[in-house]
Design a protein with these regions (language model features):
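N-terminal pre-Walker A segment at the start of P-loop NTPase domains
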Residues: 26-40
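Short beta-strand-centered segment that lines the nucleotide-binding/catalytic pocket of NTP-utilizing
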Residues: 77-92
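Conserved lysine of the Walker
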Residues: 64
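Walker A (P-loop) phosphate-binding loop of P-loop NTPases
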Residues: 61
Length: 173
């Protein structure tokens, strides 16, 4: 179990798609350290499939790269994971499937995303983890949405909201 201050809840939310309604799962996890945030990433990694896209949402310094370090560890990545702020994408190929870690902070639209070869990365059968997803949201339909929020009262506390369907409903935390 992650930390004594961990809490989780599941909420059913209705999503309209093609005039059919589907139930999706939403889970919130509270962590009290970067290590706990990484541990949640490791748990998520165990459920990932080739071609999955993770769309991160959260302010600067919220813990998106820390979460990705855990994700990478859970995929068996042996390289050091760093923020792709200046490179736009970092590739990690040593795990059970490739991990492509994108930072879209400097991009203005999905058009920019396609200019850097987005479709080529998708075709490679790995996991795409996308920071600053709000900048390219229209290209990320069907993505697993992970929102990381800082607690204004405690700089170490994060609330991680995972929206990705039933596959992520039981993380064993």
């Amino acid at each position: 179990m992650i930390g004594r201050k961990l809490f989780c809840f599941f909420a059913a939310c209705m999503v309209e798609s093609c005039q059919k309604s589907k139930v999706c799962e939403k889970m919130q996890i509270r962590t009290i350290s970067p290590e706990e945030t990484e541990a949640v990433g490791r748990k998520i990694a165990a459920k990932l499939l080739p071609g999955d896209i993770i769309a991160y949402y959260g302010d600067l310094g919220a813990g998106k790269t820390a979460f990705t370090r855990g994700l990478a560890a859970g995929l068996g990545v042996t390289e050091q994971v760093t923020s792709p702020t200046y490179t736009i994408v970092n590739e990690y190929l040593s795990g059970r499937m490739p991990l492509f870690h994108f930072d879209m902070y400097r991009l203005d639209s999905a058009d920019d995303l396609f200019d850097i070869g987005w479709e080529d990365y998708l075709a490679r059968g790995g996991v795409c983890a996308v920071e600053w997803s709000e900048n390219v949201e229209e290209a990320l339909s069907g993505a697993i949405r992970i929102t990381i929020s800082k607690d204004p009262a405690d700089e170490n506390v994060r609330t991680i909201t995972i929206e990705g369907g039933e596959r992520f409903a039981n993380l064993g935390l």
